[in-house]
């Protein structure tokens, strides 16, 4: 048992050193019990690009809740941690750091640059693990993995080679998304589309014979130097006679052909389109159909090359302005049509991507996608929570394109392909024998290795490894909806292809963390929250409680310090209840408490309130477990909160004072036993969510760690509907009296007369048997319970099931004085309403003030109106009493 609980809850003291103690005790490792059912989770590996944000804290908290509960339920649990090398993201960070010293990666060379990246990785991996510790994550560090570990790299090479042998990985020259800042290819889902201000630039391409001009329009006039044709629809009567003739490309003054192609839409624009096969995916296809040259006019950094003539060396956007100016000078510019359009931007660097002809490696997706879709109709399907994300997954799979997997980076898995001077390609898990071979310098997309994470971390391709046989497929994946396409989908099709199984049985999808106003957290808005700052102020348990109760699966959650205050207050309440129970414990052990609780359940000891709280505890255990199984942690948290704060603390703990302050020692022992037992069960129910404080309090009542303690289960012998109904009726009486006191402004300390007129003989007997509880909570001067109670004229009345409750008012208050007080109160709120109404009726204020300021005034108005209306009701009631 640990030291006595401090008088005040201090999360810093409670959490200090606790995580290291858990690690020293090896409580996070799998039990190794072969009779136990395995339950495994692989952590979505965070990028080693920096510190973890609040979204990571949410994601990992949900996983820890799941794994801690399953561990307590006796499962053989494995939560495998690890990190992702995050190719483009990490390389960009390291390049930015080097740039501060005026150094580029090219100055260092590949080997020395990679040394710098490994230093970065070690630095931030240590930071991430420190953050995991502060969050209390119960991961098994003995199995920690990194996506560039040799074992995982072996898996990557094997998958690449096997897919290549099947013809599902190929190399070719196609239009891809190019990031000019990172100088690498990007896959479609690494491109974010943003609406930006732009223009259609209309220009004339003169026929070679000078007879007429054809008007074309483009949003990227700087690519015109790569035009190798213009296209018209072969069924367009306006132009079909021109097919086969030439137009003159302005500025360069070279002839290019007019081709007939269905790509040209007669209904759109002039019906004539310029064809730039090396800079547009649709034009690329037109070029293939008509055997057009592919002219790339840009360098990999987004500057124009020598094929752009006088614009050689200019940045693409500077070239755009210069080209438009030149077109205007030579009379080829028709008009500039301003508009807003969607432009793809690099997810990592934020710059507009450039569609560009490039030789890359691709994964052929058609059969892999078909396999993944078909699997969702089998018993081995992946279950999504909420289920609607299954449709999201299937929709993406049905419309997926081939995946460009090569990246022009240095940090990552180098592609296992080698070339020789004869133009031969060798693809293998190891380098080819002999001289003259040079390995492809590109690396694989980060998501290629991440897609293998659930099984590569378990030892695959060694299918006989203990972890692979025991813990794969994994049980549950927890992740955000923003990476279903990037990661979840790819893990599913790769796992099905290489293991024949789904990678996980369940996928729990959560949303995004937003600020109080519902905005996404970002550096540009300056509204990001560091979870470590929150932990320093409130403790990890309070943050975890907020994150687990913030929303339902698939929904976003709004962070607010007001909610954090509420979380801390709840834990403080638990702390204070625990101290009260322990201070009144008198050396009672948990084993003895369990024996006494069994007697209460059997009806051999205790009173109705003891049986009631055990009944409600039992219901709480059932509902919490049921909602945990559905990953409805918010619902489970709400149930726990209501039981702990409302039923246990506010009612049962207060009701026990009737016994604990009496002289009946036998009853005291029973009451202490129920208190201690219920506290023990509460701590176990709460532990997956708030591990630190529950461990601290658990140490006061039991040996060993709560981490490996048994999770509560429903006990049929605790069911007692009769006791539950009886105590609920007692509570109704007490609440009614309290509410009536408040309505007529009578202090709780003032003794009053209470008359309870019953219409149910059983209830009458029950109230009289438990009259002391009513007295303790209502402070009566006179209390009468009977079917024929005599009721005076001037009373406050309320009705509950089976009884009517009356408070005679003649001696309690002066109705005229109370009416005067209420009228004065009403005038006060009318004044407040007038002031806020005046402000909100000011159009300039509403138009110019910040939205949150206006909303605050509207909230005030709503609050003041509610107070005003409540007083009006009170005045009406008082006037009725006078009559």
Curated annotation (Swiss-Prot):
<keyword id="KW-0963">Cytoplasm</keyword>
<dbReference type="Pfam" id="PF08264">
    <property type="entry name" value="Anticodon_1"/>
</dbReference>
<keyword id="KW-0175">Coiled coil</keyword>
<feature type="short sequence motif" description="'HIGH' region">
    <location>
        <begin position="46"/>
        <end position="56"/>
    </location>
</feature>
<comment type="subunit">
    <text>Monomer.</text>
</comment>
<dbReference type="InterPro" id="IPR002300">
    <property type="entry name" value="aa-tRNA-synth_Ia"/>
</dbReference>
<keyword id="KW-0547">Nucleotide-binding</keyword>
<dbReference type="InterPro" id="IPR009080">
    <property type="entry name" value="tRNAsynth_Ia_anticodon-bd"/>
</dbReference>
<dbReference type="InterPro" id="IPR001412">
    <property type="entry name" value="aa-tRNA-synth_I_CS"/>
</dbReference>
<dbReference type="GO" id="GO:0002161">
    <property type="term" value="F:aminoacyl-tRNA deacylase activity"/>
</dbReference>
<comment type="function">
    <text>Catalyzes the attachment of valine to tRNA(Val). As ValRS can inadvertently accommodate and process structurally similar amino acids such as threonine, to avoid such errors, it has a 'posttransfer' editing activity that hydrolyzes mischarged Thr-tRNA(Val) in a tRNA-dependent manner.</text>
</comment>
<feature type="short sequence motif" description="'KMSKS' region">
    <location>
        <begin position="520"/>
        <end position="524"/>
    </location>
</feature>
<keyword id="KW-0030">Aminoacyl-tRNA synthetase</keyword>
<protein>
    <recommendedName>
        <fullName>Valine--tRNA ligase</fullName>
        <ecNumber>6.1.1.9</ecNumber>
    </recommendedName>
</protein>
<dbReference type="InterPro" id="IPR019499">
    <property type="entry name" value="Val-tRNA_synth_tRNA-bd"/>
</dbReference>
<dbReference type="GO" id="GO:0005524">
    <property type="term" value="F:ATP binding"/>
</dbReference>
<dbReference type="GO" id="GO:0004832">
    <property type="term" value="F:valine-tRNA ligase activity"/>
</dbReference>
<keyword id="KW-0067">ATP-binding</keyword>
<dbReference type="GO" id="GO:0006438">
    <property type="term" value="P:valyl-tRNA aminoacylation"/>
</dbReference>
<feature type="binding site">
    <location>
        <position position="523"/>
    </location>
    <ligand>
        <name>ATP</name>
    </ligand>
</feature>
<keyword id="KW-0648">Protein biosynthesis</keyword>
<dbReference type="InterPro" id="IPR014729">
    <property type="entry name" value="Rossmann-like_a/b/a_fold"/>
</dbReference>
<dbReference type="InterPro" id="IPR033705">
    <property type="entry name" value="Anticodon_Ia_Val"/>
</dbReference>
<dbReference type="InterPro" id="IPR009008">
    <property type="entry name" value="Val/Leu/Ile-tRNA-synth_edit"/>
</dbReference>
<dbReference type="InterPro" id="IPR002303">
    <property type="entry name" value="Valyl-tRNA_ligase"/>
</dbReference>
<dbReference type="GO" id="GO:0005829">
    <property type="term" value="C:cytosol"/>
</dbReference>
<dbReference type="InterPro" id="IPR010978">
    <property type="entry name" value="tRNA-bd_arm"/>
</dbReference>
<dbReference type="InterPro" id="IPR037118">
    <property type="entry name" value="Val-tRNA_synth_C_sf"/>
</dbReference>
<dbReference type="InterPro" id="IPR013155">
    <property type="entry name" value="M/V/L/I-tRNA-synth_anticd-bd"/>
</dbReference>
<keyword id="KW-0436">Ligase</keyword>
<dbReference type="Pfam" id="PF10458">
    <property type="entry name" value="Val_tRNA-synt_C"/>
</dbReference>
<feature type="coiled-coil region">
    <location>
        <begin position="809"/>
        <end position="844"/>
    </location>
</feature>
<dbReference type="Pfam" id="PF00133">
    <property type="entry name" value="tRNA-synt_1"/>
</dbReference>
<comment type="similarity">
    <text>Belongs to the class-I aminoacyl-tRNA synthetase family. ValS type 1 subfamily.</text>
</comment>
């Amino acid at each position: 048992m640990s030291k006595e609980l401090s008088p005040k809850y201090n999360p810093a003291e409670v959490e200090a050193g606790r995580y290291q103690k858990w690690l020293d005790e090896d409580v996070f490792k799998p039990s190794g019990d072969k009779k136990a059912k395995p339950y495994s989770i692989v952590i979505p590996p965070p990028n080693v690009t920096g510190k973890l944000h609040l979204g990571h804290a949410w994601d990992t908290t949900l996983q820890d809740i799941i794994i801690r509960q399953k561990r307590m339920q006796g499962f053989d649990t494995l939560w495998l941690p690890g990190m992702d090398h995050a190719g483009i993201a990490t390389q960009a960070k390291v390049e930015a750091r080097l740039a501060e010293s005026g150094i580029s990666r090219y100055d260092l060379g590949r080997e020395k640059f990679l040394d710098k990246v490994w230093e970065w990785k070690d630095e931030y991996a240590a930071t991430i693990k420190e953050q995991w510790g502060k969050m209390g994550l119960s991961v098994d560090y003995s199995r920690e993995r990194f996506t560039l570990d040799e074992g995982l790299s072996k898996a990557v090479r094997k998958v690449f080679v096997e897919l290549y042998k099947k013809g599902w990985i190929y190399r070719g020259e196609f239009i891809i998304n190019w990031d000019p800042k990172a100088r690498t290819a990007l896959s479609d889902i690494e491109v974010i589309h943003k609406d930006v201000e732009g223009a259609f630039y209309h220009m004339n391409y003169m026929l070679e014979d000078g007879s007429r001009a054809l008007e074309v329009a483009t949003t990227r006039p700087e690519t015109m130097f790569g035009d190798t044709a213009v296209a018209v629809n072969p069924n367009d009567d306006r132009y079909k006679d021109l097919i086969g003739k030439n137009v003159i490309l302005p500025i360069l003054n070279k002839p290019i052909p007019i081709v007939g192609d269905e790509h040209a839409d007669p209904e759109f624009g002039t019906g004539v389109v310029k064809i730039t096969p090396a800079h547009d995916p649709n034009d690329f296809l037109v070029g293939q159909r008509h055997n057009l040259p592919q002219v790339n006019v840009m360098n990999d950094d987004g500057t124009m090359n020598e094929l752009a003539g006088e614009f050689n060396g200019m940045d693409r956007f500077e070239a755009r302005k210069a080209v438009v100016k030149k077109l205007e000078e030579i009379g080829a510019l028709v008009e500039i049509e301003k508009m807003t359009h969607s432009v793809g931007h690099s997810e990592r660097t934020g710059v507009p991507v450039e569609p560009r002809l490039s030789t890359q490696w691709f994964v052929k997706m058609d059969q892999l996608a078909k396999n993944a879709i078909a699997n969702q109709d089998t018993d081995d399907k992946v279950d999504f929570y909420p289920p609607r994300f299954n449709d999201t997954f299937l929709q993406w799979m049905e419309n997926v394109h081939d995946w460009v997997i090569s990246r022009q980076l240095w940090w990552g898995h180098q592609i296992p392909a080698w070339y020789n001077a004869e133009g031969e390609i060798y693809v293998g898990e190891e380098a080819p024998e002999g001289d003259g071979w040079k390995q492809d310098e590109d690396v694989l997309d980060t998501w290629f290795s991440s897609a293998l994470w659930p099984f590569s971390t378990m030892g695959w391709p060694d299918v006989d490894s203990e972890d692979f046989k025991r813990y794969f497929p994994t049980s549950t994946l927890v992740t955000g909806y923003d990476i279903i396409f990037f990661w979840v989908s790819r893990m599913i099709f790769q796992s099905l292809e290489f293991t024949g199984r789904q990678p996980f049985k369940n996928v729990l999808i959560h949303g995004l963390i937003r600020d109080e106003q519902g905005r996404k957290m970002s550096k540009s808005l300056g509204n990001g929250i560091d979870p470590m700052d929150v932990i320093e102020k409130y403790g990890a348990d309070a943050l975890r409680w907020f994150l687990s109760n913030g929303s339902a699966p698939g929904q976003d959650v709004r962070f607010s310090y007001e909610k954090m205050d509420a979380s801390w207050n709840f834990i403080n309440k638990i702390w204070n209840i625990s101290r009260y129970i322990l201070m009144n414990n008198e050396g009672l052990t948990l084993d003895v408490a369990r024996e006494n609780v069994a007697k209460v359940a059997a009806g051999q000891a205790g009173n109705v309130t003891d049986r009631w709280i055990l009944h409600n505890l039992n219901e709480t255990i059932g509902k919490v477990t049921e909602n945990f199984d559905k990953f409805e942690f918010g619902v489970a948290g709400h149930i726990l909160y209501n039981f702990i704060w409302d039923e246990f603390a506010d009612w049962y703990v207060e009701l026990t004072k009737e016994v604990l302050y009496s002289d009946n020692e036998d009853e005291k022992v029973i009451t202490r036993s129920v208190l201690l037992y219920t506290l023990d069960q509460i701590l176990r129910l709460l532990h997956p969510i708030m591990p630190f404080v529950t461990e601290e309090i658990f140490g006061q009542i039991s040996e060993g760690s709560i981490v490996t303690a048994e999770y509560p289960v429903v006990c049929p012998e605790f069911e007692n509907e009769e006791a539950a109904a009886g105590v609920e009726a007692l509570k109704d009486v007490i609440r009614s009296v309290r509410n009536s006191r408040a309505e007529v402004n009578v202090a709780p300390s003032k003794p009053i007369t209470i008359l309870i007129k019953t219409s149910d003989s059983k209830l009458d007997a029950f109230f009289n048997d438990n009259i002391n509880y009513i007295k303790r909570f209502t402070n009566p001067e006179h209390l009468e319970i009977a079917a024929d109670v005599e009721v005076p004229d001037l009373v406050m009345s309320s009705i509950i099931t089976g009884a009517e409750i009356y408070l005679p008012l003649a001696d309690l208050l002066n109705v005229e004085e109370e009416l005067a007080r209420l009228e004065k109160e009403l005038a006060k709120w009318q004044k407040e309403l007038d002031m806020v109404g005046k402000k909100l009726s000011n159009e300039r204020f509403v138009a110019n003030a910040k939205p949150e300021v206006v909303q605050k005034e509207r909230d005030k108005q709503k609050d003041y109106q509610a107070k005003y209306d409540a007083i009006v009701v009170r005045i009406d009631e008082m006037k009725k009493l006078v009559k």
